[in-house]
């Protein structure tokens, strides 16, 4: 079993290298505090256009300032182009340079809940804040035009973190590599909630598709790639029991906002 698992992983890693995919594989729990904070927001339908503009004009500028100061290593605001009852209107993803830098965000929260100042709070409200780790992520060398990307966000709950890590390594990552090989997926991030207590997500997948056409091929490509993996014993084992490992909740299609009214 160990030899088989190593061969499967080596094959996946070789394919990822050929694709130019930067990847991270989680083998053990993190040894420091979480450096990722994710915040979701809800806005009344009448306020959504103004809230979108506020995020692009004001919020992104404040986050860029924090990045310039070295507090953030990366940030992103995703906006749901549709009004949906059971998800969110916007989500901010903050990647901090160090765990200690998250204290700066706590200070901001004292006067700007969820990072929103008074003007922002008139347009929307922060709903949930998650402290998370980012054990798995990757991106192709040439992801295409930023403004064309379509983001697909999938929350999961699981019963065992250790089993879930093995599931992602053996079942999810080989498929993700295949989707990248097919040219439809240009990047992915898989977060794990550091404090998964209560009816919140334990793991959050954020996929970036090359464009709307590529996103439309999602089901076709999933089926095609799975056919190439079905003869791998470890992949097949997790495929057969995946429903006992995790539970999926409502997905969100989103665009990444950028200054000036576009998406990225």
Positions of PLM-derived features:
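N-terminal secretory signal peptides that target proteins for export/translocation
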Residues: 1-7
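Bacterial N-terminal signal peptides
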Residues: 10-21
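Short S/T/G/P-rich N-terminal loop/turn motif that feeds into the first structured element of a domain
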Residues: 26-114, 121-231, 236-264
